[in-house]
Amino acid sequence: MRELTKDDVLAAVKGGSVFASGGGGWVDHGLEIGGAALAVGKPKLVSVDELPDDAIILTCTAIGAPAGRDWQMLGKDYIKAVQLIIEKYEGKIVGVMTPQNGMSSTINGWLPAAALGLVVVDATGDIRAHPTGKMGSLGLSSNIEYETIQAVAGGKPEIGSYLELIVKGTVARTSNILRTASDMAGGFIAAARHPLPAKYIKEHAAIGGISIAIDLGRAIIEAEPFGPAHVLETITEKTGGRIIGTGKVRKKDVHYSGAFDIGTIEIESEENTYILHVMNEYMAVEDRGGKRYSTFPDVITTFSIETGQPVSVGNIEEGAEIAVFAIDKAKIPLSSSVKDPSVYPEVEEVLGIELYKYAFEEKKEINV
């Protein structure tokens, strides 16, 4: 167990931005929420092995489309979502975890943990960011015997979009309800969900996910004074990732629908045109001939050639010079969530491409 610091906040945002895979929130939001956590308390990071098997851990997150522009999530909303669970749940909540890393989502839970006297557990529902709550639900999405409890809070009271909601039921049904609530609240909403014992977390989460992001962030911070090329080299070396290709953004065709950013981004190089399939995050990379280069749950990230910084889907602009980067799933801890075949059809239908087949059924990943 150790106390999280201001340096950890910056490192978590920097490293989390790589694992964000084009989504995972916003840098400014992550810094703000992390700073608020340190202002109201002393959040502590603990290994799941430090907790008794029956200690109850809650997942803290935010639900929505990162490119949305009419949402509002304040620090109090993250706290309120956890409080709603605490009020209704019969057991005692001991700690919080995040379902994913990201520009701000690595820091999910730090503020309510600091405010409510909980610990931050060093585990993630997925090492990278993903579009649906089911993909970070620790393999529970297809379990109809598990009754979860989920709560959300957020929106703009001045325009009547503020919502608080608490629901019980299966993971699949309740997750769909909260996605609708997010849309009604302006496109993003703070959430808390899935109280689970530490024993289950140990068996099903991506253990050490927070520390992995923080360690990468520290390496990035050390590399930044030496320029963007050195930053990209450092990230590649630290993660075992690879640059799939570099080029100019030829076309961005991404639209908002049902609290998701959906579409494609085309990166044109001298040798090839890469198509990035987007559902909030980058879910696959292929070329016009259909050759697949990377598929979720690989980490897929776009970097600015000019700055060496990750660029989110919402901030990608046509004409920008971009590097397409990937970390093969074999080089990251995988949770039960991303191995669960039931979480893929919804996303595959929206994108119009296959994911699970490429990720787990066939050896089709191309190392370049």
Spans of features found by a protein language model:
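Oxyanion-binding "anion nests"
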Residues: 213-269
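N-terminal low-complexity or amphipathic/hydrophobic leaders
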Residues: 10-62, 308, 312-330
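Short, acidic/small-residue loops that bind anionic groups at enzyme active sites
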Residues: 114-134
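A structural-propensity feature for long, helix-poor, extended segments
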Residues: 51-67, 135-180
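Glycine-rich oxoanion-binding loops at beta->alpha junctions
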Residues: 51-94
